[in-house]
Amino acid sequence: FLYKKKEMKIWDGNHLDLTFEKKENNIKFIGKKGNNVICKYYTKKIRKNFQSQVKSINYNKHFWEIKLNTEKIVKARSVIFTCPYPQLKKIARKYLDKKFLKLKITMEPNITTMVAFKNQKNIPVSSIKFNDEVLTWAANENSKKRFKSSNSLWTLQSSVKWAKKSINFYKKNKNVENMLISKFLNFTGFKKNKIIFKKTHGWKYS
């Protein structure tokens, strides 16, 4: 649907799978302008308040009252929480059905590093899936053709097993970031002295 609407496009190019796992559908779709096009498309006709902290949410018989840190009160017929299940249970427990609270939902951590290499030649590879205990996947952001850059931009994704061991201290311990990058350098041959930017994000529940 969103492909026909030209909100999404096919991510073409070579997607290397070094795990040699058989895939039935190799077509990969990505947002034409970014990763959040699905959210933007389905909320484009809805009023929004960005960078507003929610202080309280209360149900008033017929509607919800959402109080923001600006003291503004937003009234709504429905409230949708988009947060991990463990956090949802804490912040909305009194509004949730008991059956929902008893669900056994497994959330897994993820650590991702964005890294840029100066003046690297564009290589004909869009993504690489690794058979490794630390680094499992890397995406060539240049191959998505959302922008033009003389630098080589990559997103590196950790394995779930390794993320479980590292998620609680990745911000303070630079060895976590360095390990992901080191693995990528070893696999691809990119040079460490060409790195001009690196940034790591972690999600305890993903």
Where are these regions (language model features)?
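N-terminal FAD cofactor-binding segment of flavoenzymes
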Residues: F1-N14
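Short beta-strand to alpha-helix junction loop
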Residues: L16-Y41, N168-M179
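A structural motif corresponding to the C-terminal end of an alpha-helix
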Residues: Y42-N49, F187
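A conserved short coil-to-beta-strand element within the FAD-binding core of flavoproteins
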Residues: F50-E65
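Glycine-centered tight beta-turn/hairpin loop motif at sheet-sheet or coil-to-beta transitions
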Residues: L68-E71
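Central helical "cap/lid" subdomain
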Residues: I73-I128, F190
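Anionic-ligand binding region
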Residues: I123-S152, L156, K164-S166
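Flavin-binding catalytic cores
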Residues: K148-L153, S158-K204
